[in-house]
From Swiss-Prot:
Cellular compartment(s): Nucleus
Sequence positions bearing Phosphoserine: S144, S146
Entry-annotated residues carrying Phosphotyrosine: Y130
Species this chain originates from: Mus musculus
Region (Disordered): 138-161
Descriptive protein name: Cell division control protein 45 homolog
Length: 566
């Protein structure tokens, strides 16, 4: 059921309990977790934190801890499946679910006892009515009941005939109801999409309780920016949520106006920015940032010689010397940095790039540590998705979580360096895929498969990294192809996962269009294609549009997907 009063029905309920916190491996979930941790520390709430990267880990962790806890909080996992069916919990277990995955499973919505959904009702959820999905068991029992009293034979026969007619009518009604139910559930469940950032939901709770701090506000901003970076929400939703957070930024700044105007070693200041859509440019050179931003790489077609010439023309149009562009942004001439944003935007307009700036936020720690929200998203994600040889998944999770604290800026800077390598690997892989024509049309969708032995291939076996690569590849492909039909197609991408087990990670990405509602139909399509061909798949990720597949079953799985979507 949906929780209406988060403070009373959630926070005050767990306030005096020992709580188990299951947190998914995405940046928004980490930010929501940081806000909740800060609230729990403030109120001395006892909790245990368990990172989970998929359903198997969640089930295992629940079985391991269920004896010690009655209250469980799930962040960015659990809303879009029948949670009670998966976990088979004891009757006294209560689950609070704060999850951005949509649609919300109908059993979770209508379970009043064990499932408590911490989900904003303003999100357009369109949950089907209870009576359209669930039927009273007593009605079904009526169908099988037959009367056997001692009436006269003729009377009995007449009543029996009436009962048969009535039973047939009820059976027909039931069949019609079941057919309608199937259609309603299909319409409701066919697309996967995302709701309000969990970090924003948790910040809202802190604000309602008058416990919101600047740090919490920053984590809410990073959570929202994570959704924007990964194309999980529409531009309209992003701008609306930025507006909500902007009001909080103004409120916090006004409250601390005297200190904020005086920068000090200890100060933390958040500012609204209308900044450049260039990745990590303040921590890199402008040249590297232009090369490794998906928007500019796609628009200039930087995988081609012609595209690289166009980039040189773009820099010449701005009047920026190559020496300045290729050195670290921090070392650039101050006179050039002053109006750099305006210069870039003006030249970008001439080159047909209208979206070079975006509404965002920055944070400044003391005199010299300044970060854009997107810098933190890339750094944190890179720490979390580092290849396993550098440590376990839990180690990476804890390191990523730590990097969000001001006291661990060294970890954040380490994340920025990793992010640069990841972004370079992404653009090099895109260039390789486009130059060797690895993206092919399968009819209803485009398909691309990374081969074992491809440079950096281990990096793209992770779901977030592969999804980001797929989105950026699709964007670049749309600008590179002359085939109009192909520009409107979605993309399915595969990358090797485990050579020993012979498995690949497969991700499905919706079409790259300006009007896209960011809804993804691949989750259900993958499920049906696997079922119809008995392909050995593992639907282990919280995002339904990412699966593990046995490499041997790939061709029959793809054939089924083609016929399903044709």
């Amino acid at each position: 059921m949906f929780v209406t009063d988060f403070r009373k029905e959630f926070y005050e309920t767990v306030h005096n309990q020992r709580v188990l916190l299951f947190v998914a491996s995405d940046v928004d979930a980490l930010c929501a977790c940081k806000i909740l941790q800060a609230l729990f520390q403030c109120d001395h709430v006892q909790y245990t934190l368990v990172p989970v990267s998929g359903w198997q880990e969640l089930e295992t962790a629940y079985l391991e801890h269920k004896e010690q806890f009655s209250y469980f909080i799930l962040i960015n996992c659990g809303a879009n499946v029948d949670l009670l069916d998966i976990l088979q919990p004891d009757e006294d277990s209560i689950f609070f679910v704060c999850d951005t995955h949509r649609p919300v499973n109908v059993v979770n919505v209508y379970n009043d006892t064990q499932i408590k959904l911490l989900i904003k009702q303003e999100d357009d959820l369109e949950v089907p009515a209870y009576d359209d999905i669930f039927r009273d068991e007593a009605e079904d029992e009526d169908l099988s009941d037959s009367d056997g009293d001692g009436s006269e034979p003729s009377e009995k026969r007449t009543r029996l005939e009436e009962e048969i007619v009535e039973r047939n009518r009820k059976r027909r009604q039931r069949r019609e109801w079941e057919a309608r139910r199937k259609d309603i559930l299909f319409d409701y469940e066919q697309y996967e999409y995302y709701g309000t950032s969990s970090a924003m939901v948790m910040f809202d709770l802190a604000w309602m309780m008058s416990k919101d701090l600047n740090d919490m506000l920053w984590w809410a901003i990073v959570g929202l920016t994570d959704q924007w970076v990964h194309d999980k929400i529409t531009q309209m939703k992003y701008v609306t949520d930025v507006g909500i957070l902007q009001r909080h930024v103004s409120r916090h700044n006004h409250r601390n106006e005297a200190e904020e105007n005086m920068l000090s070693v200890d100060c933390t200041r958040i500012s609204f920015e209308y900044d450049l859509c260039l990745v990590l440019y303040q921590h890199w050179s402008l040249h590297e940032s232009l090369y490794n931003t998906s928007y500019t790489a796609a628009r200039f077609k930087l995988w081609s010689v012609h595209g690289q010439k166009r980039l040189q023309e773009f820099l010449a149009d701005m009047g920026l010397p190559l020496k300045q562009v290729k050195q670290k942004f921090q070392s650039m001439d101050v006179s050039l940095k002053g109006n750099l944003r305006e210069m870039i935007e003006e030249s970008a307009n001439k080159f047909g790039m209208k979206d070079m700036r975006v509404q965002t936020f920055s944070i400044q720690f003391g005199f010299k540590h300044k970060f854009l929200a997107s810098d933190v998203v890339f750094a944190t994600m890179s720490l979390m998705e580092s290849p396993e040889k550098d440590g376990s998944g839990t180690d990476h999770f804890i390191q990523a979580l730590d990097s969000l604290s001001r006291s661990n800026l060294d970890k954040l800077y380490l994340g920025l360096e990793l992010a640069k390598k990841h972004l370079q690997a992404t653009q090099q892989t895109i260039a390789s895929c486009l130059c060797t024509n690895l993206v092919t049309s399968q009819g209803p969708f485009l398909y691309c498969s990374l081969m074992e032995g491809t440079p950096d291939v281990t990096l793209f076996s992770k779901p977030a990294s592969l999804s980001l690569l797929s989105r950026h590849l699709l964007k670049s492909f749309v600008y590179s192809t002359k085939n109009r039909r192909c520009k409107l197609l979605p993309l399915v991408m595969a990358a090797p996962l485990s050579v020993e087990q012979g498995t690949v990670t497969v991700v499905g990405i919706p079409p790259e269009t300006d009007s896209s509602d960011r809804k993804n139909f691949f989750g259900r399509a993958f499920e049906k294609a696997a079922e119809s061909t008995s392909s050995r798949t593992l639907h282990n990720y919280f995002d339904l549009s990412v699966i593990e597949l046995k490499a041997e079953d790939r061709s029959k799985f793809l054939d089924a997907l083609v016929s399903l979507l044709s």
